[in-house]
A protein has these predicted regions:
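Active-site nucleotide/adenylate-binding loops and adjacent lid/helix of ATP-dependent enzymes
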Residues: 4-5, 100-181, 211, 235, ...
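Short, charged, surface-exposed secondary-structure boundary motifs
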Residues: 38-41, 55, 98-104, 217-218
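ATP-binding N-terminal substructure of ATP-dependent carboxylate-amine bond-forming enzymes
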Residues: 1-94
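Generic C-terminus detector
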Residues: 367-371, 375-422
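Active-site "cap" helix and flanking loop/linker of ATP-utilizing ligase/carboxylase catalytic domains
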Residues: 246-268, 285-357, 370
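Internal nucleotide-binding/catalytic subdomain
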Residues: 156-293
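Solvent-exposed alpha-helices and their adjacent loops that cap or buttress functional pockets
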Residues: 21, 36-38, 60, 90, ...
Length: 422
């Protein structure tokens, strides 16, 4: 079969890597792809939001399955566009992807169906938000309602910070129209964990757990980013917690979406907080996480095509999801200055050192070809993933492998700053 993957980052490189292992697949295309993906797939210069050209390409090449990976096209209806043209597509339709596309929608859904989450209020005008904050307890969390590249969340320690946050999100439109509505949420404490789940509209099957580091700087300081590294599994996500989440979060979320006429098929990313008062939902995403996919997919034993087709066909209940009994750690190699401002176009060397090494992966995020040289082309440049028998070995292997790669403004969070893995 012929597969088209839509996207261009490290997540898409991990997805393409998994698809390339399937005996069922004869040809992979990726639109637009990147310099690393080009080693496994034919990259096509079509943007992720150019639905007309994507559909036309899929028809022309007689694509059997399209995998839509990023949030923007999913929320905008990419799967709907492919399905309308009679092309099988993996991912939620727009009316289900709203669970990520609108934080206000997802919070209201959880409230309506009794799914545990933080207390919150939604606001559509800045004055009301500012008035609410006058009597609020701090710290408090402000969230832009719409998509903001994973950066539309502000944790405010006092009223002054919160006022500045309202101005940034709602008045200055720092996140564009994503800030037309804003969610103000109680600040939760505890350990965060991410659980990606395959869904077929009725059945939901969690993958192995993961935990990511969002802060840009060492010691969990600096601005929130799309993710500076991640590890899997989370040692804090126990069998008992998994069973609780299945009965109180995962299954109820699937049932809630179905009851709302928004059947969810694809990958549901559940961002959870393990608080002193139990596990609560921080956020939902309607797709594989980045960089979570880069540690979860390398540990999956199943043929990913079998699982994706089961999600589309509504037969996920017949799939036995299996993961290796080991660990994986991904360290992001970023451009110094990310996520604010950074230079790009620097040549990258050492990529060939990953060739033929089964338990080491280098997933390209912000790279491109400059002639026949691979150069940096983004804030998050590469994700170096390594496996090990446990998290300690995997982390040591991953940090050792980051030394194999050099480029001029390379930045990683130091091993010393990585949160403990026990």
């Amino acid at each position: 079969m012929k597969v088209l993957v839509v996207g261009s980052g490290g997540r898409e490189h991990a997805i393409v890597t998994s698809i390339s292992k399937s005996d069922k697949v004869s040809k992979i295309y990726c639109a637009p792809g990147n310099a690393g993906i080009a080693a496994l797939a034919e990259c096509v210069d079509i943007g992720v939001m150019d639905f007309d050209r994507l559909v036309a390409f899929a028809k022309e090449k007689e694509i059997d399955l399209v995998v839509v990976a990023p949030d923007d096209p999913l929320v905008a209806g990419a799967v709907d566009a492919f399905e309308a043209a009679g092309i099988r597509a993996f991912g939620p339709r727009a009316n289900a992807a709203i669970i990520e596309g609108s934080k206000a929608f997802s919070k209201d859904l959880m409230k309506k169906y009794g799914i545990p989450t933080a207390a919150y209020e939604n606001f559509t005008d800045a004055d009301s938000a500012l008035k609410y904050l006058e009597t609020a307890s701090f710290p408090i969390v402000l969230k832009a309602d719409g998509l903001a590249l994973g950066k539309g969340v502000l944790i405010c320690n006092d009223l002054e910070e919160a006022k500045a946050g309202v101005k940034e999100i709602m008045l200055d439109k720092h996140f564009g129209s994503a800030g037309n509505t804003m969610v103000i949420e109680e600040f939760m404490t505890g350990r965060e964990v991410s659980v990606l789940c395959f869904c077929d509209g009725t059945t939901i099957k969690p993958m192995t757990s993961a935990q990511d580091h969002k802060r840009a700087k060492d010691g969990d300081q600096g601005l929130n980013t799309g993710g500076m590294g991640t590890f899997s599994p989370s040692p804090f996500y126990t069998k008992e917690i998994d069973e609780y989440c299945m009965e109180n979060i995962y299954k109820p979320t699937m049932a809630a979406m179905k009851a709302e006429g928004r059947e969810f098929k694809g990958v549901l990313f559940c961002g959870l907080m393990m608080t002193p008062n139990g596990v609560k939902v921080l956020e939902y995403n309607a797709r594989f996480g980045d960089p979570e996919a880069q540690v979860v997919l390398p540990r999956m034993k199943n043929d990913i095509i079998d699982v994706m087709e089961a999600c589309i066909d509504g037969t996920l209940d017949k799939v036995d999801l299996q993961f290796e009994d080991n660990a994986a750690v991904c360290v992001v190699l970023a451009s110094d200055g990310y996520p604010v401002s950074y230079k790009k176009g620097y040549p990258i060397s050492g990529l060939e050192k990953f060739d033929g090494k089964d338990d080491y992966f280098v997933f390209h995020a912000g790279t491109k070809f400059d002639g026949d040289q691979i150069v940096t082309n983004g804030g998050r440049v590469l994700g170096v993933t390594a496996k090990g028998k446990d998290l300690f070995e995997a982390r040591a292997n991953a940090y050792a492998a980051t030394e194999w790669i050099t480029f001029e403004n390379k930045y990683i969070r130091s091993r010393r700053s990585a949160p403990p893995v026990r």
